[in-house]
Amino acid sequence: MKFIVLVLFCAVAYVSAQAELEPEDTMDYIPTRFRRQERGSIVIQGTKEGKSRPSLDIDYKQRVYDKNGMTGDAYGGLNIRPGQPSRQHAGFEFGKEYKNGFIKGQSEVQRGPGGRLSPYFGINGGFRF
């Protein structure tokens, strides 16, 4: 008797499982998650070189180029030093990643004393081994 009930239960489960596999809707699938928008980042960096005064940079960076291992970021923000008024600056960073190294560069413009613009350019690189 128990064996007959078990076989009957398995048969009902099998038939109901087959009925669930049949497609009820032929409507196309619409994804509910939207692609993320590219966003920038806020970077806070403090530096102190040798016996000079410390400085604090607060920047907003936005990635403007990113293909084949090359990147380009535009940024702008404030440079704060104790005892001096804060200075605005803007610049561009670029870089290229290689299999065993990298090369990066930076250009920046900042208002100097008297309101003049003072440019800054730099380049660096490295090898991994």
Curated annotation (Swiss-Prot):
Leader peptide range in chain numbering: 1-17
UniProt keyword Oxidoreductase present: no
Gene Ontology biological process terms from the UniProt entry: defense response to bacterium; innate immune response
UniProt keywords, alphabetically: Antibiotic, Antimicrobial, Cleavage on pair of basic residues, Immunity, Innate immunity, Signal
Coiled-coil annotated residue ranges, if any: none
Annotated propeptide span(s): 18-36
Job of this protein: This peptide has antibacterial activity.
Protein name, entry field: Hymenoptaecin
